[in-house]
Regions:
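Conserved residues at beta->alpha junctions
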Residues: 15, 41, 67
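Structural micro-motif
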Residues: 54-64, 73-74
Length: 92
């Protein structure tokens, strides 16, 4: 049996060498949630870009689920724990 989350897509703002960012991406993957990564400092995105999107952001990761702002890794864990009650099971 394969489980699939009712959440469809995530956006993860991250930086290299960030253990919490790696943890967030692993958690999303374990829930079957695809994500786009916005890597700060890798040439495409800057800290300014993140602040424009999340004015109070002072750390990474910053995470959006289905276009709604969630917060960092602790908030993601809480959100997925709540949504885990609604996971559906696909019969194989």
């Amino acid at each position: 049996m394969q489980t699939k989350s009712p959440l469809n897509k995530a956006e993860v703002w991250s930086q290299t060498n960030c253990p919490a960012c790696q943890g967030a991406k692993r958690l999303l993957t374990s829930f079957g949630i695809e994500y786009d990564e916005c890597m700060i400092g890798a040439g495409t995105y800057t800290k300014k870009d993140l602040i424009e999107k999340v004015p109070n952001a002072r750390s990474v990761p910053q995470i959006f689920l289905d276009g709604q702002y969630v917060g960092g890794l602790p908030e993601l864990k809480m959100r997925l724990a709540i949504n885990d009650n609604y996971k559906t099971t696909t019969l194989g």
